[in-house]
């Protein structure tokens, strides 16, 4: 278990440090404000740019970066521009889930699944790209329909935020950009993530040492991941695998995805993935079907993923009220469409 979980934890810690320091350098603030300038006062244009930004951040820096760091930026921007904030709130949380299929680094569940892809001698991206694109397009279409009135609005273009330290800003932005090609190069993702984190820590140690604190390390999340590994391993050894194999079946990918989605919404997507991995590890397509369920299908309940819980906390801080019911009814529209559409694309 140690050989499998150690690279995952190294990546998790490194990418969190990178995202937090990039946020401190105002990379995300500037990106959001530049989007507002490029959109030239049209909300629909601004929304499409936020969609692109949320998708890119999720794919390269993981769903937590989108849900936790981009959300407060776009919510504050929405309030300043007098745009209803729920449009951007749901854009970030939904794309944090549905845009997290493409690369192994996009979601912790994908990183865990990478072990099985190596065992099966299969290329992750070769199997994931079609359902990943389908999931993003379906999400964008549903958002456009649900928030069509807000998308017709206009706003006054805001000033670009002041950057205190351009060396930190460009250094952080450069690391974020370079991580993209590094993550798809075939190198173990823990290495470029660790290198990027070390570069930024060194840069901040020289120019802004006060930003370096132990709270940058996601200690609680690391402990949670280790505890879940141990707990699910124990339950699997005592009959859980047989029960899930009966429920999910052995041949229908949509049934597997639906079972995974149900489990994610009941108990969180990480334990749902860990519990169901032995049911899906026969081939690469079943593994991606499982990931579709736990990544894209976890958007019915506020506890469906850790990223959603953190996103809700950011919404509360920004005084954007998201009740469990408002999240559920919108999720009931998106989830069946995105899960079914992604499974169809997987087999296309």
Give residue ranges: language-model regions.
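Hydrophobic mid-bilayer segments of alpha-helices in multi-pass membrane transport proteins
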Residues: 5-17, 168-178, 187-204, 217-230
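Membrane-interface alpha-helices at helix entry/exit sites of multi-pass transporters
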Residues: 41-49, 79-92, 119-130, 283-295, ...
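Juxtamembrane and boundary regions of transmembrane helices in multi-pass small-molecule transporters
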Residues: 83, 122-166, 303-348
